[in-house]
Amino acid sequence: MVHLKVVVLDSFHSFNQLAFNQHAFNKHAKTYHLFAHIQQQIAICLVQFLKQKHYAKVLDLGSGSGAVFNALERQNILIEDFIALDNSINMLKLHPTHSINIQKISLEHADFEEHVFCDYDLVVSSSSLQWARDLKSVLEKIAFFSKEAALAIHTDFSLHEVHEFLSTPSPLRDLKTLKSLIKNAFKNFQIELENKRFALYFNRKQDALNYLKKCGLLGGSTLSFKQKKHFFQNMAFEKLSYEVLLFSGIKRS
């Protein structure tokens, strides 16, 4: 049995994109949600930023198997129309389709960068936007079409142990860059920003490796068998760190 300890650090996830791809994500979709402890904790923190208890139309970008949905349920937030959008069809198959508090649930298989936006009362995204090729454009569209937005975006601190071990740079943006992009895109919003660090501690190195595998990491054709073997045999850490920038904003009237 794997014993995990989730710790939220006082200071202000992301995955290694080089070791994370849609093939691996789809391959491990059925077990991903069982190992997505950090993602769920981040979604819970994000939803606590919301200013209202009732929304007419909500869009969840990069919904995955439903971390934001579950967090909304936990907070008893009422929603008339909820759209869960994700580019992994297998993840969407795991997303809840029934709710006491949400009247209509729609699942949309699409890339959030190609999504045709319309007007939303709330756009939310947790642990997804860090993979945007053109984050500036996505943020500007969210700001234009939403009355309220709540976003959790991973920084380059996430999984730094893995990057340091493999001597690879993180593909993610740093905290300063993310803050600048958000402030520029949401100039017409009253905003709140907070960065949080999370940590997973494992009893054994094998548990840490299994976690990475089950989350779709180190999968696909990114690492060779030899590289994976070297990674496990020489991996010197039993802790994985994550950092997210939490943003919430309401459009000024």
Please annotate each region the language model reported:
Residues E113-L122:
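A short acidic, Gly/Pro-enriched loop at the edge of an enzyme's catalytic core
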Residues F35-Q39, S65-A67, S170-R173, E192-S253:
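Conserved Class I S-adenosyl-L-methionine
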Residues K147-N203, L218-L223:
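Conserved catalytic/acceptor-binding region of the Class I
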Residues L122-D134:
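A short SAM/SAH-binding and catalytic strip from SAM-dependent methyltransferases
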Residues A56, D121, K147:
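Conserved acidic residues
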Residues K136-A149:
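A short glycine-rich, Lys/Arg-flanked "PGG" loop and its adjoining helix->strand segment in the class I
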Residues L59-E114:
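Class I SAM-dependent methyltransferase SAM/SAH-binding core
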Residues V2-Q52, A67, A71, M91:
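Conserved class I S-adenosyl-L-methionine
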